[in-house]
């Protein structure tokens, strides 16, 4: 019995110790404490790149289509410049494709253009085509134009992105963003019972104050849309307008709207009042911030700083019919082709959304009800005469703006809107040159995309690019996906020459790294811990706080790589063209055959003086730049025998955790031994 009791004592202690060990294991499983936590400051783009390269496509469900906005490449987004990228063409059927996720857009557009006879220029959106769901600013343009016929395509071959549908044409009264469709291989998401249920689909306009974004609508009026006399006016109300220039940022227009309201600069009669901003006024306010950084404006505007300049009737004529343009038609009651089946009703999110901190307000319409406290100054007789002098109903009168007394600055009082308005600045895509105060701002003509009907859209785009047209200087320097490629080929086809070795480094930001995605599910579906297995079954239980940021960095890097590769290919194309011309001449053989007639140059004359320029240095510099940016950045060693997962550094927290568990077990054994 004694021996039996002695043998039973360790067995009882072992049972108690095992109980505590199983409690620890179950606690770890229930709460999914990760063995290693990768934070934002430790996970680099190279690490993510290595994970992506190690992942394999196991099923077609991992292939996701994502819409990438052109504005992420740094293209100009102001209305006068953006509309130059669109043009009408007849005989080309539209194409519609679906995609699963898209970027949050800073600038979206909504067009409602009519002909002079009142007929519509743009087709009605088919059933299933809805507004782009994530827009910081919606530029709503209404007015008239000749509309040469056909449909409105993108001259540079891009898509018009709607809600999970990308079309090659613009639909009337439907908000869209410019972009392209990319296909990404994403790892399978592990299904877990803690996963949040699907919520409502994303939308721009919402009455939910808990939404993580804020949309502002800016209204414009256009006259002679698509011609060489196109004139855009920023609409303050139905009688007050401001002559629009490419240098005006959305933030400037929002503050300009508040200033006009607070300083009583609106038309107080039945006629139209058109203002023109002094060309010396600095309008480059704001910065790339998107929704995650709700920063206040660093400056406010006053009437003295703006220096309003009157525009006489003879230099600006706005059609009276523009104020009565019918409102946009809903995108849910459409005739024609039905694209509803292309949008999945229960599509799963491609990328988990981050919980954007900060309080937001309801969407704002710039031309809506005034949101600032009116100026205490009454509209006196002088102000009334001053306003009547510029209303477009009478002839040009004396300019009283230079003699108007200065006013006390009236600051806007709507602090909520100023905190939620998102600063954005695009200095590389804005024109800063002064404009004449007496010449109305005009845009270039929308040239037709060509008369030959291509079989596919890329062919149509190439034919369009071959048409010589004036190009804005800022467009030439834009680091876009398609813009540099097409314009470079256009320069070759139109005979534009380039000085040898004149490639200069681009000091402007090549793309905006702050990219966020929207999916079929609302951001609320990702609140809390995101259960995301990281690229493979070996990393089960690992999660990261920096997934979104590093994936954004990857996309930005891919954009840079594509941009630099495109520039190198442009040089290759030109070098090939010149070498081909030179090889056709093949002077040595031809001179030998034509010696008795004086040689090639004697027969051909100046045409034989074609010397292929040496572009090797330029091409080599571009390739070296690509190697420096994307190859020399050493990645973790895949062949490390001790690292079959994510690198030995990732095992440091895991080792600490395992060591802690071992110490806890030893402590429990000691406690149990002394207790028993």
Curated annotation (Swiss-Prot):
Query: Sites of glycosylation?
Result: 40, 204, 228, 257, 268, 296, 414, 441, 563, 618
Keywords linked to the UniProt accession: Clathrin-mediated endocytosis of virus by host, Cleavage on pair of basic residues, Coiled coil, Disulfide bond, Fusion of virus membrane with host endosomal membrane, Fusion of virus membrane with host membrane, Glycoprotein, Host cell membrane, Host membrane, Host-virus interaction, Inhibition of host innate immune response by virus, Inhibition of host tetherin by virus, Lipoprotein, Membrane, Palmitate, Secreted, Signal, Transmembrane, Transmembrane helix, Viral attachment to host cell, Viral attachment to host entry receptor, Viral envelope protein, Viral immunoevasion, Viral penetration into host cytoplasm, Virion, Virus endocytosis by host, Virus entry into host cell
InterPro entries cross-referenced by the UniProt entry? Ebola-like_HR1-HR2, GPC_FiloV, GPC_filovir-type_extra_dom
**Site (Cleavage) residue list:** 501-502, 637-638
* Topology Extracellular: residue spans: 33-650
User: Per the UniProt entry, what are the Gene Ontology biological process annotations, in alphabetical order?
Assistant: clathrin-dependent endocytosis of virus by host cell; entry receptor-mediated virion attachment to host cell; fusion of virus membrane with host endosome membrane; symbiont-mediated suppression of host innate immune response; symbiont-mediated-mediated suppression of host tetherin activity
Per the record, where are the segments of Polar residues compositional bias?
A: 402-422, 452-463
Q: Which cysteines are cross-linked by disulfides?
A: 53-609, 108-135, 121-147, 511-556, 601-608
| Region of interest (Receptor-binding), ranges | 54-201
Which residue numbers mark the site Involved in receptor recognition and/or post-binding events? 57, 63, 88, 95, 170
**Lipid-attached positions, S-palmitoyl cysteine:** 670, 672
What else the UniProt entry mentions is: Filoviruses entry requires functional lipid rafts at the host cell surface.
Its protein name is: Envelope glycoprotein
Query: What is this organism's lineage?
Result: Viruses, Riboviria, Orthornavirae, Negarnaviricota, Haploviricotina
